[in-house]
């Protein structure tokens, strides 16, 4: 199993950067900041695709407000782990796999939505696998 330092180094090496807060585009300029409770409610009720671009940008702003991503689209692994959304046992490989899937994406809204939607799908698949394994 990877330790936290190895995971951080691996993720930093594999993760590309995307500029969110440029003079050309900032997806959160017109968004009101949500309370922490409201932001967590949005995360718990993650929408099912297809999602329009405006909602992807809204979700990006929620992720930024919660500190789960930075303005370049990098996942803040420590905050993500503390959020309780993911389990350390499988997170390293899945985070890298999802990040690689969107490595060419330069649009912050598409990038952050894509990565976190991938995380959600992987987490649901893992939970389903565990429930099936426990039922046997």
From Swiss-Prot:
This is General odorant-binding protein 57e. Belongs to the PBP/GOBP family. GO terms for biological process: response to odorant; sensory perception of chemical stimulus; sensory perception of smell. InterPro entries: PBP/GOBP (IPR006170), PBP_GOBP_sf (IPR036728). It comes from Drosophila melanogaster (Fruit fly). Residues 1-20 form the signal peptide. Disulfide bonds join 28-61, 57-109, 98-118. One of its GO terms (cellular component) is extracellular region. Gene3D superfamilies: Pheromone/general odorant binding protein domain. Keywords: Disulfide bond, Olfaction, Sensory transduction, Signal, Transport. GO terms for molecular function: odorant binding. It comes from the Eukaryota. Pfam families: PBP_GOBP. Present in the aqueous fluid surrounding olfactory sensory dendrites and are thought to aid in the capture and transport of hydrophobic odorants into and through this fluid. The lineage of its organism: Eukaryota, Metazoa, Ecdysozoa, Arthropoda, Hexapoda.
